[in-house]
């Protein structure tokens, strides 16, 4: 319950910031274009706080925190007095209306650059993307990837840490091939470029990582069988496991690596497992019944809410991504461009069917991401805000009526035919666009629930 509440609070904060940025873009440009703004609202529904500013605009925070809006004076929906006609949105020139509508997404992109700029100036801990394990006969093994190699680039884009590697791999979902530039972990010798055949790459984001589906895992420090965390009210606590216990046997088999424990728990949802642990020099036998979690396609795995002791990272594998003021700005622009490219690429692949609808995420996934990154720290939360802000900006530019991109599409048509698109056509477009948007939202929310 505590995690759910924390995720909800972080989600509300994140959404409030991003919606405020987006709507402020519309508001600010509208005011600069001479349009009267009647209301600026964060959220929908009944207002829980509001005030009228000196400019005559009503500023409001509403009960439903799933968006916001800017209400401008508009002759299409209100009777506008003759003396205020020049301040109505619909009376503005085509370029002014286009500027007002496009300002929301543009401000989202600018905010992302600002957030990444802060991230790179503050600095974020990172580890070198060194390969730890390669599964025999996997796609990675066939391409010649080996343990100890450091991934320098994915398809020519530098990858200083695992986050950038993961972004690069995800960007190739649905492609036939990609290249990975590698070197030894010590940096000795020349870099090698490996071509990865992706035709047999079956990647389900609900069950594994992109690199796991390719057949390799990151290097991780030694993981012992000693428990350092037992979640309250979890299956491990109910079984009597305690922090400090060392797992010796699972179902009578000696435990040589922690992965054996993970495999046993995941393969026994709601089924008893005999566990022997060492506690204060004594051997203790327990019965663990893992809880169950349903993944995609009805697959059910077990989980117990326990975590092992992990050794410290070697010093030569750790570093901090931190730069000066001006270099951070350049890095922020570069990072934002990479995220934009990845998001646009994924949208295209979604449209043509190269990427399945099960990759869509909704508000529950966003809330979990907000809570997790906020728990890690301010700089991680900032990075999350930048990522979601870019996605929000791009989604709003999709040419579907009801979105900013739909309005811009109507304006483009108006520029060609030299008259506004007929109201009936716009109304039909809004209905079709609304149906598509709500259908995609339903799929995204369904995906969220399958991942719980």
Curated annotation (Swiss-Prot):
GO terms for molecular function: metal ion binding; metalloendopeptidase activity. The active site is at residue 23. It is found in: Cell inner membrane. Pfam families: PDZ_6 (PF17820), Peptidase_M50 (PF02163). Zn(2+) binds at residues 22, 26. Disulfide bonds: none annotated. Gene3D superfamilies: 2.30.42.10. It is a multi-pass membrane protein. Keywords: Cell inner membrane, Cell membrane, Hydrolase, Membrane, Metal-binding, Metalloprotease, Protease, Transmembrane, Transmembrane helix, Zinc. GO terms for cellular component: plasma membrane. Its EC number is 3.4.24.-. Its cofactor is Zn(2+). Residues 197-292 form the PDZ domain. One of its GO terms (biological process) is proteolysis. Its main location: membrane. The chain crosses the membrane at residues 98-120, 378-400, 428-447. InterPro entries: PDZ (IPR001478), PDZ_6 (IPR041489), PDZ_sf (IPR036034), Pept_M50_Zn (IPR004387), Peptidase_M50 (IPR008915). Belongs to the peptidase M50B family. This is Putative zinc metalloprotease VC_2253. It comes from Vibrio cholerae serotype O1 (strain ATCC 39315 / El Tor Inaba N16961).
